[in-house]
Amino acid sequence: MAIRFYRDYTPGARDRLVVSSSEGTVRFKPQKKLISGFTCRKGRNNRGIITSRHRGGGHKRLYRQIDFRRSKRGISGRIVTVEYDPNRNAYICLVHYEDGEKKYILHPGGIKIGDTIISGPMATILIGNALPLTNMPLGTTIHNVEITPGRGGQLARAAGTAAKLIAKEGRLATSRLPSGEVRLISQNCLATVGQVGNVDDNNRTLGKAGSKRWLGKRPKVRGVVMNPVDHPHGGGEGRAPIGRKKPLTPWGHTALGGRSRKNHKYSDTLILRRRRNS
């Protein structure tokens, strides 16, 4: 995919960069049997309380049912389309399997229309194939990695991301995740060979506030311009500093660098190195 530059004929188009499909392979019309309704929760829970701020609005979407489990074991499939998915920054592929079933998977970088993929323990180490970590050599680049066997891929699913298999010992394998975290994973977990496609997505520049609203993201108001009743940073005369030793969240917890992970979690024993930004 290529990066498209906009001329500054309007303020919104100035400095705007989008990922364009110059090859014409990205399709926007989904498979009808693989879509379902999608209700925007606007960051609210079942009681209507805001649990995730700055969410709401955005364009109406249909959810594409992605096969993160790669459930068609031992049956080869052919890549028919590469499609745009409004629910994620990675593209998706429509796969036609030999038994006639159709499924969506994440688009592995380098896979083209007409290529053949397969999943299962006997799959070869080729881009797009899915197999257990125990059957992969060290140094393999992987994505869509399972945490629990059979639950479906949960790690390294964003556009352009990939994990790396760096060690095996006993029943566990060691992998380096895109965040820099080094984690132990069961060797029975499934992963897909290769990197997620659309690697140029991190170079995208939206260009205007309206583009952010199309994605369902609302404006973020700084706490220092609020009233004291609304935020710990609020209040004061004019442009006053926050008046605290360190920045705080609206609920009084440490912000901007403070640890937010709970202590005494089961997965603490599986994490050998924390993320770079934690």
UniProtKB/Swiss-Prot annotation:
Family, per entry: Belongs to the universal ribosomal protein uL2 family.
Subunit structure comment from the entry: Part of the 50S ribosomal subunit.
Record's keyword terms, sorted: Chloroplast, Plastid, Ribonucleoprotein, Ribosomal protein
Biological-process GO terms, alphabetical: mitochondrial translation
SMART domains xrefs: Ribosomal_L2, Ribosomal_L2_C
Spans annotated as Disordered: 224-267
GO cellular component: a single term: mitochondrial large ribosomal subunit
Subcellular location: Plastid, Chloroplast
SUPFAM superfamilies, per the entry: Nucleic acid-binding proteins (SSF50249), Translation proteins SH3-like domain (SSF50104)
Name of the molecule in the record: Large ribosomal subunit protein uL2c
The keyword Chloroplast appears for this protein: yes
Domain of life of the organism encoding this protein: Eukaryota
